[in-house]
Structure formats: C-alpha cells, structure tokens
Amino acid sequence: MNLMQFNFLILSTDGRFRTMANMSLDNEYKLELAKTGLFSHNNLIKCIGCRTILDKINAKQIKRHTYSNYCISSTNALMFNESMRKKSFTSFKSSRRQFASQSVVVDMLARRGFYYFGKAGHLRCSGCHIVFKYKSVDDAQRRHKQNCKFLNAIEDYSVNEQFGKLDVAEKEILAADLIPPRLSVKPSAPPAEPLTQQVSECKVCFDREKSVCFMPCRHLAVCTECSRRCKRCCVCNAKIMQRIETLPQ
C-alpha cells in the first residue's frame, strides 16, 4: 500500500480500525479508538485530527485524547454520541466528585452537547466548542453560540436539579395522578368496567394497578412489572430518567 492509498484509508473509521489489525487489543476497544481519529502507523498510534503520537497504549493519555478540548476528530465523535459525552462525567476523579449523585443533571448536560474534559469545574460543548466554568444547567444552556446544533436541545419537561434531595412529602405530591374530568355526556353503551378501575389500571398490561411514576414527565401510568420494560413514557413518549414507586390508590 502506497502513501496515497494509506492516507485515503485512514479517512474513515473502518479504515483506521483496519490499521490496528496486528495490535493485541480487543476489537471493540480498537473501534472506540478509531472513532476518535486514532490509527496505527509504523508501530506508533497517531491521530488524524490532531498531533497526538503515542508509542504505546497509555490509558491516561487515551482518556485525555478521547475527551479532548483540542482534537477535531474526538470532538466530532463526542458531538454525535450522547453516551460518550455522558461517560466523560465519570471518567475523571474531579468530575465524579463534582457530579456525585446527580445523574439527572449529567443526563441533561450530555443531551445538551456538553462533556467533561478534565479541567476541574469546567465543561466544553461538542457542538460550538465553548469552554466555561459550570454553574447550573440553565447557565450552561445560555453559553451555546448562536449557530450551535445544541442551542435548542432542551427537554419538553423541566427537572429540578436537586430532585434527588426532595423530601417524602414532595415526592408524594409529584407522584399524584390526576383523574380525567367527568363529562356530562351520556354514553352510547355501558362501560365495560367501573371508571375507577379504568383510571387505576396499568396502561400497558391493563391488568395490574399502576404504581410507578415516571420522571421528569410525572406520569403515573404503569405497574411495577411493566415499568421495567419501559424506556420512554407510554403517555407522552418522554425519555424516562427516574422511576418512583407509589402506594396503591
């Protein structure tokens, strides 16, 4: 393979992955490296998007490159991979300490394009590349540049950042189910079962009583068994970030 062919090969993730064929690494790990722009050449690990050159796999250096604030290839990979951005918040000791027990906040930040790149207290947007000191989710959202693809990436429902700290009384209020209003319209046929039973039955199996409240949308719609299979709310299709079990009505 001549140099021109090799340069063409490393333009794609698959091509960079193929350059690592002789490396004694797990294929899944090789693919992750290739996604961030890394490839193997003359027994060295190089990057197509920055000047990174490694003579061997170094976990710390690989992590710094993966969540880089300077590499074009890593930034592009982060921009198209929310799970990768989310993982950055658990990849550094300082981020684990800062965002401990704040999984909902981390989800919201990752969804908005932000990731942690190793500088204590600071975040970077994978879309507009803005770097700033983190204060709150709302403040972070205002930092986006006007042409950023994540500028309007806001959930339909707002979540209190300190939701995990709500007391029992507040959680019971959030878990309350609103019964649909009764209409003064005479039905054309008698109901198959009492209205109270329809209101309290699970919207998935229509058998057991609903007892799990989804957050952040706050819909109480399914039973405990069915809730385990739900990734999105069956009422509004919002992504489920937390489940709260309630007492039978």
From Swiss-Prot:
InterPro entries, sorted: BIR_rpt, IAP, Znf_RING, Znf_RING/FYVE/PHD
GO term, biological process aspect, one: symbiont-mediated perturbation of host apoptosis
Swiss-Prot/TrEMBL keywords: Apoptosis, Host-virus interaction, Metal-binding, Modulation of host cell apoptosis by virus, Zinc, Zinc-finger
Pfam families: BIR (PF00653), zf-C3HC4_3 (PF13920)
Entry superkingdom: Viruses
Molecular function terms from GO: zinc ion binding
Zinc finger (RING-type): 202-237
Keyword Protein biosynthesis part of the UniProt annotation: no
BIR repeat spans: 85-152
Binding residues for Zn(2+): C125, C128, H144, C148
Primary role: Plays a role in the inhibition of host apoptosis.
Protein name as catalogued: Probable apoptosis inhibitor 2
Species of origin: Autographa californica nuclear polyhedrosis virus
